[in-house]
């Protein structure tokens, strides 16, 4: 098989197999071909991974942040040297076009290792607090063994986004990728060892829904970071809360993207397309509710239709391809079901809505789809679809659109397109979301915090904020005189 790894798991610096685990077949979404066959972690594999992480962590934490950072920065260099190889693996794993993966997947993972490797020494400093004759100081200390649970839309990126800050702060990690995309994280673990990371600090185990609870409920795990769905997030949060474990989670969204009538039309349409069709719509922060001011609605839709129908759908390994298949048949069928529901509830289909011609019929392809005349009550405007389905809604004024944009259980992201920056800042101040964009969309460089509010989770990926989530504050009071006691 074209992408078969040496074994299913990577524990304590080496590949490990246990064929007693449930079989996981890695399927190339473009052809339906089985490209690798792995096994889910048994309870014994879970124990081995956590034991390795627990054993290795204290010595790693005792190293200077500069020394830890040097290893992470070397991992970033190796990832960049092998960007093509890693990008092709990511395309096989996810079905995303090589045109995307070569600029957005391993590269963002490398950015994460480089960034956290570079800031560890400075960002982990504490404070000195003078108290007259006495004084106190604070220091940030690692949590211990951390668990990362990944999603299938950006498997390599997520493996790095969770691993880099955890390791920079002096923790160890056990990472479980999605069973849909099991391959990329194994390569990240390999590269970290090559970069000089001591064995046991970054372990990868495969698994399904039964594996997560074994990790989350383990008494030696101090922290859990999840990227996934809201229902999964609630289960993980409840389990972590029962043991008072640290937890951060980046969950789903149904984000608003607001286009005022003074916006640059081409830029706004480009932002809406990036916020709906990139990665075949499988991005949690997508602006899938596109609110367009009524005055420009017709012009917006006409040009959007032209540009959408010009998207090149095809072989993900062809660098001309702009839209690949969905990650799995189950996900494609789910999206097609939402499209049928949209039509049944009265939304107007502008373009797309089906399976494209002239592609591999065994692949899980779907047309980029645009609905107009969508109302707030429709299912496609309320529920996360996680596919290339854009809902265009009309609005008249600012107060109306802000209220409607906020009328959702989610709060991951939002975007505003307008030539009036005063209005843009006024609107984003009112929008209930964790990550917002003005006159652009879905850019998430490692330097800025990324995360949501409401049902979209809590905590932040990236930036110094992420590093803080992998540490806790220790306060030390130093008495400089004799103790006076009334006893």
UniProtKB/Swiss-Prot annotation:
Disulfide bonds: none annotated. HAMAP family: BADH. GO terms for molecular function: betaine-aldehyde dehydrogenase (NAD+) activity; metal ion binding. Binds 2 potassium ions per subunit. Keywords: Metal-binding, NAD, NADP, Oxidation, Oxidoreductase, Potassium. K(+) 1 binds at residues 26-27, 93. K(+) 2 binds at residues 244, 454, 457. One of its GO terms (biological process) is glycine betaine biosynthetic process from choline. The active site is at residues 162, 250, 284, 461. Its EC number is 1.2.1.8. It is an enzyme of class 1 (oxidoreductase). Belongs to the aldehyde dehydrogenase family. The keyword Hydrolase does not apply. Involved in the biosynthesis of the osmoprotectant glycine betaine. Catalyzes the irreversible oxidation of betaine aldehyde to the corresponding acid. NAD(+) binds at residues 150-152, 176-179, 229-232, 252, 284, 384. SUPFAM superfamilies: ALDH-like (SSF53720). The gene is betB. Pathway: Amine and polyamine biosynthesis; betaine biosynthesis via choline pathway; betaine from betaine aldehyde: step 1/1. The modification Cysteine sulfenic acid (-SOH) is found at residue 284. This is Betaine aldehyde dehydrogenase. It catalyses: betaine aldehyde + NAD(+) + H2O = glycine betaine + NADH + 2 H(+). Its cofactor is K(+). Dimer of dimers.
């Amino acid at each position: 098989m074209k992408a078969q790894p040496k074994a299913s798991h990577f524990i304590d610096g080496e590949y490990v197999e246990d064929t007693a685990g449930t079989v996981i077949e890695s399927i190339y979404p473009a052809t339906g071909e089985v490209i690798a066959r792995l096994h889910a972690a048994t309870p014994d594999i879970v124990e081995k991974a956590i034991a390795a992480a627990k054993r290795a962590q204290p010595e790693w934490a005792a190293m200077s942040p500069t020394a830890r950072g040097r290893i992470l920065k070397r991992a970033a260099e190796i990832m960049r040297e092998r960007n093509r190889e890693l990008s092709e693996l990511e395309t096989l794993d996810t079905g995303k076009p090589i045109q995307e993966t070569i600029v957005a997947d391993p590269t963002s993972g490398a950015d994460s290792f480089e960034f956290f490797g570079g800031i560890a020494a400075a960002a982990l400093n504490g404070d000195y607090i003078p108290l007259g004759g006495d004084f106190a100081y604070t220091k940030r200390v690692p949590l211990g063994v951390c668990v990362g649970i990944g999603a299938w839309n950006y498997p390599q990126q997520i493996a790095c986004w969770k691993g880099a800050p955890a390791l920079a702060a002096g923790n160890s990690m056990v990472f479980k990728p999605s069973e849909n995309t099991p391959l990329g994280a194994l390569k990240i673990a390999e590269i970290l060892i090559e970069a000089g990371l001591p064995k046991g600090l970054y372990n990868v185990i495969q698994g399904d829904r039964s594996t997560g609870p074994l990790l989350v409920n383990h008494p030696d795990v101090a922290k859990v970071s999840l990227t996934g769905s809201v229902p999964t997030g609630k289960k993980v949060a409840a389990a972590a809360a029962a043991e008072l474990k640290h937890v951060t989670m980046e969950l789903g969204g149904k984000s608003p993207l607001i286009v005022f009538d003074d916006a640059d039309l081409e830029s706004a349409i480009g932002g809406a397309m990036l916020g709906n069709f990139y990665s075949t719509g499988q991005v949690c922060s997508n602006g899938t509710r596109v609110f367009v001011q009524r005055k420009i609605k017709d012009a917006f839709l006409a040009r959007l239709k032209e540009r959408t129908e010009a998207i090149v759908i095809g072989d993900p390994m062809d660098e001309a391809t702009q839209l690949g298949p969905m990650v799995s048949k189950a996900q494609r069928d789910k999206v097609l079901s939402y499209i049928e529901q949209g039509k049944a509830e009265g939304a107007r289909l502008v373009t797309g809505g089906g399976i494209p011609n002239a592609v591999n019929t065994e692949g899980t392809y779907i047309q980029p789809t645009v609905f107009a005349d969508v109302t707030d009550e429709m299912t496609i405007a309320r529920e996360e679809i996680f596919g290339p389905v854009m809902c265009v809604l009309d609005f008249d004024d600012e107060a109306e659109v802000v209220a409607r944009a906020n009328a959702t259980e989610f709060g991951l992201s939002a975007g505003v397109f307008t030539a009036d920056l005063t209005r843009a800042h006024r609107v984003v101040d009112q929008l209930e979301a964790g990550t917002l964009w003005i006159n652009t969309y879905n850019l998430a460089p490692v330097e800025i915090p990324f995360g949501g509010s409401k049902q979209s989770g809590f905590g932040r990926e990236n930036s110094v904020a992420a590093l803080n989530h992998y540490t806790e504050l220790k306060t030390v009071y130093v008495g400089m005189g004799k103790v006076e006691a009334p006893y």
